Structures are given as C-alpha cells and as structure tokens.
C-alpha cells in the first residue's frame, strides 16, 4: 500500500478509533488526539509540490476487482494536490478551532468520528482515478455531512437541514452515477485519465449529451448551484466548525472539482460552456442578492458561499472556451482557469475565517441575530480585526487576496463577452453585466456583515450572554487564515508556480507559464468596473434600510424552498397511498405481486434478449424419475385445491419427500437425508401450530382465487426452469466444480465433496447460518419465557386482589 493510499485511509481508520479513545480519555479534549491526522496529511502533501511543479504526476494502484476494471486507483496531479492541501490544511485549523468551540460535555466521540469520516471521503473524491471509487467516496461525503449537520439532533432545524442536504446531494449523486456509467460505455474503462485521453470517443458517443447533463447535475447539487442551492442555508444549523469546514473549503468545492476534472472531456461542447457559465453567473447574482436580506450571521455567510461558488463555477465555464480556440487566443480564455483556481484558494481563507468568527460571536453573545448584535468593537477587538481583513477581502477591496481574484474574474467576463459561440455576439455581454451586479451585492453584504456585529448600538439586554472576547484557541485558526489573506494579497507569486500553474495545467490543454497577479493593471475595463462596484455598493449601503424591505417581501410561493417543502409533504403521502394499495397484511397478495413481477421479467427478457438452450449434455431421463416427478406434480396441484389444512400439510410433505427420493436417484444421499429430516420436522411443526389455531376444519375458496394461485405457481415454476436452462446453455465462465474436484481431497482432506464445501470451503457461510439459527432459537426461547413470566405475574396480581 502506497503513502497516497495511506493518506486517504488514515482519517477513516482514526474515525473508527476515536470513539474508543473517547471512552478512556474523557478528561482530555478529544480534539488533541484528532489534530495530528490532518497535520500529517498536510505535511505529506507539501512534500509532493515539487513533483507537480515539474509537471509529473503520482499514480498508485491497489487491486480490488481487476477483472471488472475496478481498483483503488489514486491519481495526484496539480489539481488533486491543490484540493488535498485545502482539505488537510483547513481541516487542521478547523480541528484546532473546535477544541475551543466544543466543550468536553458534547458527544465528541461522534463529532470527530464523523469529521474524520468526511475528511477521508473528500480526499478519496479528489484523488480517485477510478470513477466508481470516486462515486463511493462522493456518496460517503453526503452521508458523513448528514451526520455532521444533524450533530445537535435534539434541534428540529438540524434534522430538517440534514435531511434536506442529504436528499438533494444524494439525488445529485445518483445523477453522477448515471453519468459515469454512460462515460464508461464508449471507453470500456472506469479510469478518469483514460477517459480524458480518449475524449474524442466519448464525444462521438450517442450518450455524450446525457452523460454531460447528468454529471453537471451531480456537480451543481454538490456545489449548491442554482436552483439546488436551497440545502446550504439550512445546513448552517450544524456546529460552526462543520460550517467552516464543509461549507467553505471542502464539500461544496467537490462539485467545482468535478467540473474542473471533467472539463477536458466535455469542454468541446458549447452546451457545456454556456450551461456552466450561466448557471454560475445566475447563482452569483441570486445568492448575493439574497445574502443582503438575511437576519442571521450564518445565513449571510451561507448565501455568500453560494454566490462565491457561482463565481468560481462561471470562471470554469469561461475557461472552457479555450478548447474552441488555438494558440494565443486559447491562452486568453484559459486564464479564466487560473483565476478560478486562485479564487478557490482565496475563498477558503477568508470564508473559513468568517465562519469561525461567527462561531466566536455566537459563543460569546449567545446569538447570531443581527437585530440583537452591534457595538462589539471595543469588547471583541481581535475578532473585529480578523473580521475586517477577511470581510474586505470577500468584498474585493485591496490590498487583500480577494481583490486580486475578483479583478481576474471581471477580466474573464469581459474576455468571454468577445467569444463567438452559437454565433450570438450580443449575448456575451450578459457575462460582465451579471458579474458586476453580483459583485455590487457582494460588496454590500460584506460591509454590512462588519457593521451588523461591531458597529451601532450595544444592546446587552437583548443578548443571552454577557459579551466577551473568546479564547486564544478560537482566535488562532481565523488569525492564521487572516494572515494568509494579507500575505496572498501582497505576494500572490508564492502560489503561482507551486500550486496555481500545476492545477491549471491539469484542467487546460494549453500550458500557461506566465501567470501573474497585480494590484493595478492600468485603466482596464475590470478596474473601471471595480470603481463602479464600490460607488454603487456604498450607495446601496447608505439606502440599505429602504430597499432591503422590498426583498424581504418576496412571496413565499416564488421561492424554491416553498416548492421543496410542499414536495416533501405531498410525495410521502402519495407514496404511502400507493404502497398501501399493493402492500397489505395478507401475505398471499404480497407474494402474488412479487412472483408476478418475476414471471413478467422472465418472459420479457426471453422475448427481448437472444439466448441459447443446449440439451446436448443433458443426462437421459429414466422411467422411475418420470414417475416420481408425476407424483410430485400431482401433490403440488392438489395443494392448490385442498379443502382442509390437514390435507394441505400431507400433500406438501409428499412434495418434499418426493424431492428427497429424486436426490437419492441423483446420487446425493446427504441432500436426501437433509431434505427428509427437514420435511419431517416441518410437518410436525405445521401440525403442532395448526393444533393451536382456530378450529377451521374446512374452508372454501373461490374458483378464480384457486386458478390465480395455480397460474402464479405454474408461472414461477416455468420461469425457474427457463432460467436454469438458459444458465446451463450460456456459460460465460468455467465451472467452479472442477476446482472442488481437484482440491477437495488434497487441500481439505475430505472424501465427501458436499460436506467439504459446506464445512471447509464455505465454512464461514455455514458458521454464520448456524449462528443465525441459534440466535433465532434464543429469541423464541426468550419470548416464551417472558410470556410465562407475565402470566405468572398476572396470576399473582389476581390472587393479591
């Protein structure tokens, strides 16, 4: 096993160990045991920077099911390294922050188990080269995030948010599964790199459009893009460390990673360019607009996260235009990939810090309601300093890193407006217009975020707690991120050659080796747009109290949340009615549906799929075998029209004993003896059970009822015969019986092949089957004993009375 595999598996292993440690070390905060895990992974990933800088990659394989092309293949290039550093780096800071945020009285064993489970799943997503393995980790992120969001399960809002996120992201996961299966059909491979190398085969496939749509849905749901964004604001009910980790730097970035990774395959389609770009821009505009009217600090950051994800998504879509050009023109559009990567890093720094400060404010005051907050400037000066730095970066104000990536974003939108896709030139001007409007509202909610907390009147009477500055443990992580905001703003070259260029080259076929970010490029359209954004933003802040009321009057039926909630109520009701229509307490009706579906499926398959039935090697039929079969069929037929229970039991036993005789003729005495014993015991049990049932010596059934039973029974029997004959005549693999014939004597040292298979080759199966029977017996014994105990207690009460 390689170190890369260990890096992915390590958090998963510790996720199993941590709950055990929690039981023995309750006096020590469990976070200290967890902290080394992401730190070690982060340090290991740092050692791989030189590898990706030189243009090399790391490919490691761990065999799983090689015959089916499914192995635990890991592939690390510049893009995978970038996300791995974010996952482990931000993860380290979040764990450190959580030590100060969560008290020892919380269920820390559960919390850190879920967190490590999520961390390992995210590393698996960004490093997997096998799409099936990627999908498994993808769904594991949804499952673990569900557990994290619902950590405070006593709160109804937490349960609602967790269910909402799970439903939407799992829906996207199923779409992703469909998309990757369609990708694997033309390439006959599950390897992402192989698919990229053979992208032309996929593009010529009739499944190309469907695969593209399904994969985009999977990415849009995960990254909370319009209209699937509604799960993210409700997920803010999770503890703040979860919000800082999942919803700023990791989980919501998984969709962006998927779009970036699949761009070489789908970028040739103009539909990919337009859809990814417009969905990103619409998300940017809609979420930034909604962020301005939120009354909860986390609500502001939730919609802020959605809008920033939309910005990055739009840049990835614009960058895909480079696949439609050659030479220098291609490099011009490929610069959007560079801007997307840079802003992805910047967003993780300032948004992670802002979430942590929000948690600090909530921890200090007991509320996140902006109506109750204000005037905390002198009470929480360190938190104020960190907030100003990171919020101004989010607003796109120099000299912070957010300004550089925002300028790059505006430049890419102006560049995209000149692209002649679909021969609709004027439509391209929507890109900079939407980008500027979205940036204006981004500026507004960023500045208002600072004002809501630290300016205005201090209202101690409305605060559940007395406000105070939080501990150093809660300030250290956001302070580190705020420092990165300043450093990356002043010295962006630190990342260009080491991180950004290798990540960009993983997405784009055009090599860009002159990446530079500057505070001032001259009087460019992007710089002039920035001035317009500042002016309009300040005007909107001054008039905020007037126009924000219009946004808050938005009719409920026009929101996606309304339709989600309505669907969540209506669908279960209709599902229950539909289920009750065919699932009843009468087991016979349930069996009719199950067996009827089997019969239908069998005959539909027979008439739609070519097959071969081979009677060449069938053994000859002897006269006594025919007699036994006739006896067996006669007994089975009589069961259908029996008039008494006793007669049904006798005929059912006759069927079983006839099968035992057939086993003897087929030279399987062990099976015959087993069948004989089972039939004898079953018959005795049936008779004992019916003795205690109501005295119904005779019962009449309608002729149609009996005929239905006969048709179902005959259809099932015929289906099994046909399936058996088809399986016998269409063998795609060599029979395993030869293996047993060769090794049953020399390896197992046995003479009876059936016995050896049961107790040796399949010994574990037999052991667990015996265990199941034993547990069932204990359960029956316990129920009988409890019944006797209750009867005894009841008699004692009566005697006492």
Curated annotation (Swiss-Prot):
GO terms for biological process: proton transmembrane transport; sodium ion transport. It is found in: Cell membrane. The chain crosses the membrane at residues 4-25, 30-49, 79-101, 108-127, 131-153, 166-188, 208-230, 243-265, 270-289, 302-324, 339-361, 373-395, 429-451, 472-494, 526-548, 589-611, 621-641, 646-668, 672-694, 707-729, 767-784. It is a multi-pass membrane protein. The keyword Transmembrane helix applies. GO terms for molecular function: antiporter activity. Its main location: membrane. The keyword Membrane applies. GO terms for cellular component: plasma membrane. Keywords: Antiport, Cell membrane, Hydrogen ion transport, Ion transport, Membrane, Sodium, Sodium transport, Transmembrane, Transmembrane helix, Transport. May form a heterooligomeric complex that consists of seven subunits: mnhA1, mnhB1, mnhC1, mnhD1, mnhE1, mnhF1 and mnhG1. PANTHER family: NA(+)/H(+) ANTIPORTER SUBUNIT, NA(+)_H(+) ANTIPORTER SUBUNIT A. Belongs to the CPA3 antiporters (TC 2.A.63) subunit A family. Mnh complex is a Na(+)/H(+) antiporter involved in Na(+) excretion. This is Na(+)/H(+) antiporter subunit A1. It comes from Staphylococcus aureus (strain Mu50 / ATCC 700699).
């Amino acid at each position: 096993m390689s170190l890369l595999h260990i890096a992915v598996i390590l958090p998963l292993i510790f996720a199993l160990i941590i709950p055990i440690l929690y039981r023995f070390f309750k006096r020590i905060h469990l976070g200290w045991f967890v902290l080394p895990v992401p730190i070690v992974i982060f340090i290991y990933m740092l050692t791989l920077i030189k590898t990706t800088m030189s243009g090399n990659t790391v490919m490691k394989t761990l065999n799983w099911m090689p015959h089916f092309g499914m192995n635990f293949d890991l592939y690390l290039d510049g893009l995978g390294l970038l996300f791995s550093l974010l996952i482990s780096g931000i993860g380290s800071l979040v764990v450190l922050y959580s030590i100060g945020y969560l008290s020892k009285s919380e269920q820390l064993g559960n919390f850190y188990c879920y967190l490590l489970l999520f961390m390992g799943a995210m590393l698996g997503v960004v490093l997997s080269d096998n799409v099936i393995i990627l999908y498994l980790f993808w769904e594991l992120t949804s499952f673990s995030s569900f557990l994290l969001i619902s950590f405070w399960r006593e709160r109804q809002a937490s349960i609602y948010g967790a269910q909402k996120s799970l439903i939407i992201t799992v829906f996207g996961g199923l779409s992703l599964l469909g998309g990757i299966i369609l990708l694997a059909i033309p390439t006959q491979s599950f390897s992402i790199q192989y698919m990229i190398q053979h992208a032309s085969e996929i593009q010529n496939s009739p499944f190309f459009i469907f695969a593209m749509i399904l994969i985009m849905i999977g990415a849009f749901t995960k990254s909370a893009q319009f209209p699937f964004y509604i799960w993210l604001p409700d997920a803010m009910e999770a503890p703040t460390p979860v919000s800082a980790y999942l919803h700023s730097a990791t989980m919501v970035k998984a969709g962006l990673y998927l779009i970036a990774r699949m761009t070489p395959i789908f970028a040739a389609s103009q539909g990919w360019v337009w859809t990814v770009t417009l969905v990103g821009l619409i998300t940017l505009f809609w979420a930034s607009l909604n962020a301005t009217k939120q009354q909860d600090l986390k609500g502001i950051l939730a919609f802020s996260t959605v809008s920033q994800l939309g910005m990055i998504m739009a840049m990835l879509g614009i960058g895909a235009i480079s696949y439609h050009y050659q030479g220098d023109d291609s490099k011009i559009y490929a610069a959007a990939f560079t801007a997307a990567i840079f802003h992805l890093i910047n967003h993780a720094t300032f948004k992670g810090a802002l979430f942590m400060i929000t948690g600090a404010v909530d921890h200090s005051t007991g509320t996140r309601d902006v109506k109750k907050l204000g005037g905390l400037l002198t009470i929480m000066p360190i938190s104020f300093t960190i907030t100003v730095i990171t919020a101004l970066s989010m607003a796109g104000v120099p000299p912070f890193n957010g300004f550089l990536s925002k300028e790059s974003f505006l430049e890419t939108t102006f560049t995209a407006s000149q692209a002649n896709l679909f021969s609709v030139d004027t439509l391209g001007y929507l890109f900079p217009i939407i980008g500027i409007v979205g940036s204006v509202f981004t500026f507004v909610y960023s500045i208002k975020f600072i004002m809501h907390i630290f300016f205005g009147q201090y209202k101690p009477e409305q605060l559940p707690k007395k406000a105070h500055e939080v501990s150093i443990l809660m300030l250290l992580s956001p302070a580190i991120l705020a420092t990165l905001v300043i450093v990356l703003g002043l010295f962006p070259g630190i990342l260009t050659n080491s991180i950004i260029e290798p990540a960009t080259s993983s997405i784009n076929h055009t090599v860009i080796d002159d990446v530079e970010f500057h505070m001032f490029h001259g009087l460019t359209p992007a710089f002039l747009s920035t001035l317009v954004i500042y002016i309009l933003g300040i005007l909107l802040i001054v008039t905020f109290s007037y126009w924000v009321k219009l946004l808050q009057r938005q009719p409920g039926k026009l929101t996606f949340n309304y339709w989600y909630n309505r669907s969540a109520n209506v669908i279960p009701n209709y599902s229950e009615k539909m289920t009750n229509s065919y699932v009843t307490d009468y087991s016979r009706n349930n069996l009719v549906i199950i067996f009827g579906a089997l019969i239908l499926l069998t005959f539909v398959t027979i008439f739609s799929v070519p097959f071969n039935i081979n009677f060449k090697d069938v053994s000859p039929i002897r006269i006594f075998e025919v007699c036994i079969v006739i006896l067996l069929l006669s007994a089975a037929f009589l069961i259908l029209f029996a008039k008494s229970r006793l007669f049904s039991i006798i005929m059912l036993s006759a069927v079983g004993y006839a099968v035992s005789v057939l086993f003897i003729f087929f030279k399987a005495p062990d099976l015959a003896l087993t069948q004989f014993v089972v039939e004898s015991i079953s018959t005795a049990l049936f008779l004992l059970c019916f003795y205690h049932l109501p005295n119904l010596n005779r019962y009449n059934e309608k002729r149609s009822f009996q005929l239905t039973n006969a048709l179902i029974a005959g259809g099932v029997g015929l289906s099994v015969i046909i399936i058996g004959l088809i399986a016998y005549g269409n063998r795609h693999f060599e029979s395993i019986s030869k293996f047993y014939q060769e090794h049953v004597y020399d390896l197992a040292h046995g003479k009876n092949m059936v016995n050896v298979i049961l107790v040796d080759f399949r010994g574990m199966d037999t052991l667990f089957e015996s265990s199941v029977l034993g547990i069932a017996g204990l359960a029956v014994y316990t129920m009988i004993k409890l019944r006797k105990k209750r009867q005894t207690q009841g008699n004692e009460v009566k005697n006492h009375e």
